[in-house]
């Protein structure tokens, strides 16, 4: 079948467009079905949605609410607390080990931040993007290490 062989379904194309402004005999001459004068008879006659005839419209009378625009550039982090990490019984803590232990989602692409000041019993080795001063001090006191990754 080719494009030039296509035919419309019978009775599917009954609607014909109105021919406007072509004399009284057409039934839609002179004012083209718009009535006499007035705003709706003009070419740009319809008002915009929400227009209330010059009265302050409802969407401007009601107060703004919510902070939808506040902090949209703010950096989000996956926050790890030392006291929770100490309970996991891991030696090396990185994204792969945290996903394996289901601490973070496998889909999460957020950078990881280490916080907390819990005293650690054994040395732990971290690979994170950011670390607080207290957490760094606690890890180093336990002879552990923190490797900072780039975002």
UniProtKB/Swiss-Prot annotation:
GO MF, one annotated term? rRNA binding
* InterPro entries hit by this protein: Ribosomal_uL15, Ribosomal_uL15/eL18, Ribosomal_uL15/eL18_sf, Ribosomal_uL15_bac-type
Q: Which GO terms describe its biological process?
A: translation
- GO CC annotations on file: cytosolic large ribosomal subunit
* Keywords from the UniProt entry: Ribonucleoprotein, Ribosomal protein, RNA-binding, rRNA-binding
Question: What superkingdom does the record give?
Answer: Bacteria
Q: Where is this region: Disordered?
A: 1-58
Q: Where is the composition biased (Gly residues)?
A: 22-36
Compositional bias per record (Basic residues), positions renumbered to this chain: 10-21
HAMAP family, per database record: Ribosomal_uL15 (MF_01341)
What is said about its interaction partners and assembly? Answer: Part of the 50S ribosomal subunit.
Q: What's the family? A: Belongs to the universal ribosomal protein uL15 family.
What the entry lists under NCBIfam families is as follows: rplO_bact
User: According to its UniProt entry, what is the function of this protein?
Assistant: Binds to the 23S rRNA.
Q: What is this protein called?
A: Large ribosomal subunit protein uL15
> What organism, scientifically named, is this protein from?
Mycoplasma pneumoniae (strain ATCC 29342 / M129 / Subtype 1)
């Amino acid at each position: 079948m080719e494009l030039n062989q296509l035919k419309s379904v019978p009775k599917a194309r009954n609607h014909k467009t109105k021919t406007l402004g072509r004399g009284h005999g057409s039934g839609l001459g002179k004012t083209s079905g718009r009535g006499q004068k007035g705003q709706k008879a003009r070419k740009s006659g319809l008002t915009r949605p929400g227009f209330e005839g010059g009265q302050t419209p409802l969407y401007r009378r009601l107060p703004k609410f919510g902070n939808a625009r506040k902090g949209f550039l703010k950096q989000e982090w996956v926050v790890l607390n030392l006291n929770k990490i100490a309970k996991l019984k891991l030696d090396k803590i990185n994204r792969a080990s945290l996903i394996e232990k289901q601490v973070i989602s496998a889909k999460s692409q957020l950078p990881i931040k280490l916080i907390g000041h819990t005293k650690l019993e054994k040395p732990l080795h971290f690979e994170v993007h950011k670390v607080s001063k207290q957490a760094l001090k606690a890890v180093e006191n336990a002879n552990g290490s923190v490797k900072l990754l780039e975002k």
